[in-house]
């Protein structure tokens, strides 16, 4: 035997063999058998052999691959059979025989199909089918799953004396529900076989597994009896006395033939499962003879049974109801007056519903839950009669049992139980079957609640209110805060007392009549709201932490404290209550928590609530709050500089993330304390101050951050100011031997030292000791007559000398020289003449100013309409302009400058430059004049500005490829001044961006005015920033204003870098103020990196101007940008939305701020005209044009104030 193909012979025979499989269908006879060990044995018969030279091959298919086997070569005897070990049990295999003579097929082949036997079931479990144990079972079988194939399961069993078998296929994971058996039947010898089936050539093969598991047996539950009912009959007294001697002492009942009165009772209680009780071996037979009655019977029918509920209440009954001591007064009087006469109980029922196999009934009679009688009757009995010899509460139940066969005896499920009460007087009391309805709770206070309910029955005489705490068991015993209702407490009062605030309770109501108690009501759950905390206190621990402490009520139950805080969150820009911490409840009456990581100088509101265990949770109380403003952090003085008697102080506050815009910081208090104490209050947005301090003193400098409720002071900075030299030193009262020196003290000085020495003598003469004086005058004596001296006065403060102040003095000669008298007279006359000349000049100056106001400041004449084309030489124009600058500003008009500006040239509108210089000393009067008649003269000037640049071309902006790059179709860049991008793309328009160069105070391309980027142009915008090496971007708009998009958000939202084309932008830092924000960007392109500052002014309305009160804010912003620009290279990029209105106003203010620093005149008209010749519509509205004038007025006012503060006059003393 061998496998094919093998070696050379296998290769030689493979192709004919495959051809044979396709060609032939007829068969040669051969024999195939399947052994028990799953081996397939294939053997040749004598009739199969054609010649010993032929090759016989077997092909076996059925598994994932085909197998080929070759019979061994043989001569006179048949070859041994081929044995194939099948891997699968229960799988069909196809065996094909092929005969090959040499390389030629000489005999057709044929196929035989065999089916292997599946592996048997190893174990079986049978369970009741809980929804229907009378007819249903759950089968669970276990069998080998690997390599085991079957289609159905054969179930065999004996049903009583009948043998049954069936094929079942609805097994899932070895389990199935079979719901077709008979109730109460014993099913024995239950076995399971796996069945495998296969169909081949219209024939079906079937194989059964063996049975290797232990046979099982199972009895289904019988149905319970039907229509169980009982009647109670009062026996005739005489009959009872005759038979009283036959009562068994050990039993509370016996049989009785004589029947007195009978009554019909209706019991509707469900019966619990019958417990094992004492079976009475001497139970009397029931009597089925005729009964003598004295009244119409009343039947208790069980058809209207109530749900099973009485057994649930057994464990919660009060102890007082477990014996007969709880009988009513009527019952007690009855039992005291009469002896109990037994009553007759007649119990009847009907057989269970067919088909049910049963062998009898079990009767269970229970009295007072302590005494039990348990007996059995056959299947023919349907009535049971017994005498009840003792009063009490009785419970009856009847069940069906089945015992025939080899299975265990089994009872039916419990049917309905019947309950009633027999009083000592023989009176029966019907069981209560209705539960209370509409149970509700009304909480009267934090410790009291009132229960209410409704009931249709009126035959109950009391109620039981059962209360239990649901929260008590949720607490650890060591931390338990309540004791009263941890176990169930019963009461007959509708009012529940001694409740605990915060606890949750469950209440059940029962109706009671005598010892009988009805079914419970639906449970009602209610909770008592906690009373909340008390004495909430706050203790600050610095700028960023506080401690909260509080006490809780002595009486109360809760799960946890929840500490919340309310504040403005600068990260989310919202204010809301957030939970900070939760503290588990303890028995301690006090609690505290430390709250850290607070923002300094910030308003907080803290709240502590008590949360209960209930579901849902209750909390109290929102009024337990306390507010607080944290202290600011201490500022840090960073620089102190002193010059010109002014001390310049700078400081920082917090770190880069500290937010002042939303804090409760009010102002800074800068204090310099020396011999004098100088204070200055500084607004919170400014961190610099200038103090005018007298020199010569030692000062302790401090900066205090002040809020509404607290402050924090920086570390003291010691500053020692050197004493200043005396001011205005004079020599008076000169004599031949003495001179008096007089000076003015400058700053603080402890004393002054005076020295005098002779001039021009080889022998230096000076005072033996310096004269130290504390006053401002000293007389130097013992001088030589007619001698010149150099005297000096030095201030001393804190042992430090100042720079000495010198004066040359000469003593008087002994006799008066006549020439001196003449010279003195001439000097006096000259002084009078000079004074008269000064008075005359002052009068002329006033008249000149009056003439300037009358002629009208800023008047200009438009010669644009004149048809004249004349040009003057350049030198002439310079001379004219130089001459005009000498005239009063009221004469600086377009009329006089007509030849200089040359409006009649060929390119007049393009090159025309309107101008109107104004002296700053006259600027206030100029503004008043221009603002007359509703800003009429401003309107005239602005109308002239509209003519600038009308004929300047902008062809690139009109190209079809570039139109989509323009935010507004009427704001287009001029070709001659537009910014051109460097692009590798040679496509037309690739270099276009809506931006123009604007000349500045320092450079002809100091600014780039551009529109707010669009989503399509943000990449071009960053390319322009990189190529122009711009380090400052000024954004004068918000991305969205009045629900309209004004500009794309072209920078990253977070610190995560974002790629804009080939350029990556990363936001390094961001700082926001009330009116602006400063951002630091880092842009990267290949190996090139550049830092860019982004200044965003957010308080500027579109097409408008900031309010008059906000003018100082915008000037401060312009000054801040200018300070940064002096440190930067490349043009500043300025944009708003269109890039003309707010952009032009900002550029004008920045240029004027620099111009006024160095000059005392301005030409606003000429400046705006020049900007409009480089980009259209710069300074877009008349309001913006007027706003520039108002800002210039403010600039000049501040410059004059600075001059007044720093104007320290030193008088030079001439030589005598």
Swiss-Prot record:
Residues with Phosphotyrosine modification: 1210
Extracellular topology ranges: 30-822
Predominant place of localization: membrane
Cellular location(s): Membrane
GO molecular function terms listed in the Swiss-Prot or TrEMBL record: cadherin binding; phosphatase activity; protein homodimerization activity; protein tyrosine phosphatase activity; transmembrane receptor protein tyrosine phosphatase activity; Wnt-protein binding
Catalytic residues as annotated in Swiss-Prot or TrEMBL: 1136 (phosphocysteine intermediate)
Signal peptide extent: 1-29
Reactions mediated catalytically: O-phospho-L-tyrosyl-[protein] + H2O = L-tyrosyl-[protein] + phosphate
Expressed in which tissues: Glomerulus of kidney. Also detected in brain, lung and placenta.
TM regions (residue ranges): 823-843
Entries under CDD domains matching the protein: FN3, R-PTPc-O
GO cellular component, one term: growth cone
Modified residues (Phosphoserine): 865
Membrane topology: Single-pass type I membrane protein
Record: residues binding substrate: 1102, 1136-1142, 1180
Function per UniProt: Possesses tyrosine phosphatase activity. Plays a role in regulating the glomerular pressure/filtration rate relationship through an effect on podocyte structure and function.
Associated disorder: Nephrotic syndrome 6: A form of nephrotic syndrome, a renal disease clinically characterized by severe proteinuria, resulting in complications such as hypoalbuminemia, hyperlipidemia and edema. Kidney biopsies show non-specific histologic changes such as focal segmental glomerulosclerosis and diffuse mesangial proliferation. Some affected individuals have an inherited steroid-resistant form and progress to end-stage renal failure.
Annotated protein name in UniProt: Receptor-type tyrosine-protein phosphatase O
Lineage of the species this protein comes from: Eukaryota, Metazoa, Chordata, Craniata, Vertebrata
